[in-house]
From Swiss-Prot:
GO biological process terms on file: translation
Gene label: RPS11
Protein's UniProt name: Small ribosomal subunit protein uS11m
Keywords tagged on the record: Mitochondrion, Ribonucleoprotein, Ribosomal protein
Subcellular location: Mitochondrion
Pfam families: Ribosomal_S11
Keyword check for Cytoplasm: no
Organism, scientific name: Marchantia polymorpha (Common liverwort)
NCBIfam families: PRK05309.1
Listed PANTHER family: 40S RIBOSOMAL PROTEIN S14/30S RIBOSOMAL PROTEIN S11
InterPro entries in the cross-refs: Ribosomal_uS11, Ribosomal_uS11_CS, Ribosomal_uS11_sf
Disulphide linkage map: none
Keyword Mitochondrion appears in the UniProt entry: yes
Similarity-based family: Belongs to the universal ribosomal protein uS11 family.
């Protein structure tokens, strides 16, 4: 009997979702387990412009849009990797769940310096 090579049925329904949450926008990228990008969505592409892109509601709407497309592509389970310090971190998780995806794992991959470069000076307004 030959060994079966390729993707298992479980991996076909699984995807990795990267949420990049900045103070000005929220970008969500869906990839398969090999890292190939399947779809992406951002607050600007959903229809929010200017300062409305950085709101919690915009992040939730972006996540719901990405979840809708993921279900159309055949994904059901999602592993979430969150990066950034923006406002839409928790809202985007809520949006993925409202969109119909099942969240299996949540990882925070925000890069934190171990006392590396000096940060820029504070703004004086």
């Amino acid at each position: 009997m030959q060994k079966k090579h390729g993707i298992t049925n479980m991996q076909k329904k699984h995807c990795i979702t990267y949420i990049q949450s900045t103070f000005g926008n929220t970008i969500i990228t869906l990839t398969d387990y090999n890292g190939n990008t399947k779809t992406w969505s951002s607050s600007g592409s959903v229809g929010f412009k200017g300062s409305r892109r950085s709101t919690n509601y915009a992040a939730q709407a972006t996540a719901e849009n990405a979840a809708r497309v993921a279900i159309q592509l055949g994904f059901k389970f999602v592993e979430v990797r969150i990066k950034g310090l923006g406002y839409g971190k928790e809202s985007s998780l809520r949006g993925l769940k409202l969109g119909g995806l099942i969240i299996t794992k949540i990882r925070d991959v925000t890069p934190t310096p171990h006392n590396g470069c000096r940060p820029p000076k504070k703004r004086r307004v």
